Amino acid sequence: MSLPNGLIAVVKRDCPTCLLVDPVLVEIERAGKPLTVYVQDDPSFTQVAGSVDDRDLAQSFRLGIEIVPTLIEVVAGQEVQRTIGWVRSEWAALTGLATLGADLPAHRPGCGSKSVEPGIAEQLAVRYGHTGMTARRVSVPPQEDDIEVCFERGWSDGLPVVPPSETRVYRMLQGTSRAPGEVLGLVPPNLSPCTIEKVAINAVMAGCKPEYLPVVIAAVEAALDPAFCLHGLLATTWFSGPMIIVNGPIRERIGMNWQGNVLGQGNRANATIGRALQLVVRNVGGGRPREIDQAAFGTPAKFTFCFAEDEATAWTTLAEDRGFRRDQSSVTLFSADGPLGCADQKSRTPQPLIRSLAGSLRAVTHVEMANAADAVVVIGPEHGRVFEQAGWSKAQVLAALHAALQIRGQDLGMGTDAAAPVASPNTAGTRPKFRPEGLTLIRAGGQAGLFSAIIPGWLMKGSLGTDPVSKEILI
């Protein structure tokens, strides 16, 4: 941007320091120095003849003004130097007027520029800047309701969404250092390219804060990993959808919940991060119910399913088990149905509690089916203490659960109409209910209640279904 040569001052009436230096600006002008004064609020307050109305803050934005007054020297249309606030020695050096403002205090701090007031900076960036956003703009007539327009265009999951204005999307993009145009991959079923900008748009609609955006991005990256088999998860007639588990320092930084009501409503980060992923699948990939999404019943968890792990336990965390350090933040995606509660309020030692958990796990998919799906077991704090007080590690609990979940082959009839199971080689011996890596233990939940939660999934069978996928959260 080419600037007027000479001196440029940016001021506002609503600033004691700007009022203080107004006579100084007159003094500069009378000394014959080329001077342009941009006034952010009331152009009539300054006595300088060369004042310019900058109430639209266009010049303040383009000049990058953060503090007023600011005095800038311009040579050949380019800024050479600037000073902020009132520092007599700096103003004198910049103007070449040694006695400038001799009767004023030696220095006085400036005030915040109107161009950086909360909510204003983003509006100016959208209006005058280069945001990097390229998504198609949709004009909404003034007489129409933005929220209703989102419903009518099919952008909603059935609940109201936040209309994704340019300003809101730009503000959301400030939550990451990644470029808006970066392509994360192709979202099934339509295999549409998904950019950071498109993720931000859907994060706005979901109700996310900008600081949640890196978590949403990582969740989208995990969902698009071929190992997760998102297309298959969408097309199945089974109940499942994506479930996001968050580990690392970002949990506390953005205020996630891993305690009471952890799988329920009430926490903005948990609710909106999971919802944002579902909206990306719907709005970018075209994964809509009764189209490609062929779930016979679905689950309320397909609105949103996201929570953080309780890392203040003696066990290794999910993230550590999957190769991350404690100081790294990560997401792990599972396919998941709704939770199945497991109550055991009597067991005070590990073995009977293992039998209770195994009894609940036996019901996953069908009590007479083995190795059909994986499951996540969310161990509540009171159940967790039973294991910890006995010195049991996570690995010991997993081994005991697998041992308790060996099913006799003759019990795998799955509701056959035959009076007795038909003998076959498959009925000999026992079968594991879950593959070796098919059980995952998570720590979370409220302090009161001898409960845990079983969360089954969909066909977690490697190449035949979906596998959990973890991604580091990058800011």
Question: What function would you assign to each model-found segment?
Answer:
Residues Q59-G64:
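Short amphipathic alpha-helix with an adjacent loop that forms part of the alpha/beta core around
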Residues S2-L25, T36:
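Short active-site neighborhood of thiol/selenol oxidoreductases, capturing the structured segment around
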Residues R127-I475:
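Non-transmembrane, aqueous-exposed alpha-helical and coiled segments at domain scale
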Residues G32-L57:
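Thiol-based oxidoreductase modules, predominantly thioredoxin-like and allied folds used
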Residues P4-N5, A31, V39, L71, ...:
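Catalytic cores of nucleotide-enabled group-transfer and carboxylate-activating enzymes in metabolic
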Residues D103-T131:
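Long, low-complexity intrinsically disordered regions
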Residues E66-I67, I72-G110:
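Non-catalytic, surface beta->alpha helical segment in thiol-disulfide oxidoreductase systems
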Residues V10-D14, Y38-D42, G380-E382:
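Structural motif
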